[in-house]
């Protein structure tokens, strides 16, 4: 007998706009939170115990917000808007004020990437004013670190991911470009380490597993492309996953490295086993494009959630494959 189709354990409504980005903060503190940011310039901070918005922060002059995250320093929120600004917010003691901002000069949809380098210090990478350039600065000082521009014509930078390898002196950055190329950059040396042509179309999204040195990317086509880094930091293309319908907005790997989720333009979330890319579930709830997916960072694995945000202005939350089920 086949399993019944999964249904959300609950949904969050009232965001008032397409949900471009989601970020969980469930690891520390008393209250598990989910941050969502909309195409109308609002950040909702959802209390997952009450399932209601604890706070709504209006920012970026009503422009679409395309990325939110929290910094390790307590109560600091970081957001990126289509107004070409990255804002740092103080949310401590009930505040909701912008304490600093960074002008990016980019009107594109490339989401920022942030990496903690030491307690209270981060690197922030973002698409720059020129279509192919990536700028990296230190936070909180805003000191410029480098600007990364490819030698070849690869078009606009579409997506980026900073990470710190276990071995090696400094951070690396993965970037997907308009011509379908992936590039690996050495931030310290400001140099390109390797490249691979992963897609015939622009790379819409990518995610990376630093423990396994393995990543996956999506585009407007029906294919997910997986790839890995060898010991010489060369990008090696691996298996492809063929989708039923074209178009992926976002990809996310669960913290334990067992699951991969994709946000589909076909209104569906697809869940795969990350090890072998085995299809596990198709989550159907939304009535428009799914724009964002995120796994929660609960310490207790049984509480882990998958959230999906859609153009239909709703967030769905799912509890799947939490009890040691075979994920392939």
Annotate each predicted stretch with a short phrase.
Residues 43-47, 86-91, 134-138, 182-186, ...:
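WD40-repeat beta-propellers
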Residues 12-19, 58-65, 102-109, 149-157, ...:
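WD40/WD-repeat beta-propeller blade N-cap
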Residues 11-41:
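Beta-strand-rich domains and repeat architectures in extracellular enzymes and scaffolds
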Residues 37-40, 80-83, 127-131, 176-179, ...:
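Conserved strand-to-loop turn within each blade of WD40 beta-propeller repeats
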Residues 22-31, 68-74, 113-121, 160-170, ...:
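Loop/turn segments within WD40 beta-propeller blades
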Residues 1-17, 50:
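A short helix->beta-strand "capping" segment at the edge of beta-propeller domains
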Residues 7-9, 52-55, 97-100, 145-146, ...:
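A structural motif specific to WD40 beta-propellers
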Residues 291-328:
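Blade-level signature of beta-propeller repeat domains, shared across WD40, Kelch, NHL, RCC1
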């Amino acid at each position: 007998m086949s399993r019944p189709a999964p249904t959300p354990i609950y949904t969050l409504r009232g965001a008032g706009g397409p949900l471009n980005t989601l970020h969980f903060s469930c690891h520390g503190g008393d209250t598990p939170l989910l941050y969502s940011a909309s195409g109308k310039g609002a950040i909702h901070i959802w209390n997952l115990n009450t399932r209601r918005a604890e706070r709504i922060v209006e920012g970026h002059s009503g422009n679409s917000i395309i990325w939110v995250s929290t910094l390790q320093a307590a109560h600091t929120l970081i957001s990126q808007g289509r107004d070409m600004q990255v804002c740092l917010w103080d949310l401590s003691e009930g505040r909701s004020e912008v304490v600093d901002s960074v002008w990016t000069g980019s009107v594109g949809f490339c989401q920022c990437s942030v990496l903690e380098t030491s307690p209270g210090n981060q690197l922030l990478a973002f698409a720059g004013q020129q279509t192919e350039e990536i700028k990296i600065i230190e936070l909180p000082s805003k000191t410029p670190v480098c600007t990364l521009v490819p030698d070849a014509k690869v078009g606009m930078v579409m997506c980026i991911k900073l990470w710190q390898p276990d071995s090696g002196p400094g951070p690396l950055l993965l970037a997907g470009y308009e011509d379908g190329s992936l590039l690996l950059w050495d931030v310290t040396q400001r140099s390109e380490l390797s490249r691979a042509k992963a897609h015939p179309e622009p790379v819409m999204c990518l995610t990376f597993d630093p423990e396994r040195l393995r990543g996956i990317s999506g585009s407007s086509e029906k294919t997910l492309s997986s790839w890995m880094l060898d010991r010489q930091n060369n990008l090696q293309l691996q298996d492809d996953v063929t989708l039923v319908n074209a178009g992926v907005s976002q990809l996310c790997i669960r913290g334990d490295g067992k699951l991969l989720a994709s946000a589909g333009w076909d209104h569906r979330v697809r869940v795969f086993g990350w090890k072998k890319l085995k299809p596990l579930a198709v989550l159907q709830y939304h009535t428009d494009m799914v724009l964002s997916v995120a796994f929660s960072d609960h310490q207790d694995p049984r509480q882990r959630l998958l959230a999906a945000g859609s153009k239909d202005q709703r967030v769905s939350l799912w509890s799947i494959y939490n009890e040691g089920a075979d994920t392939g």
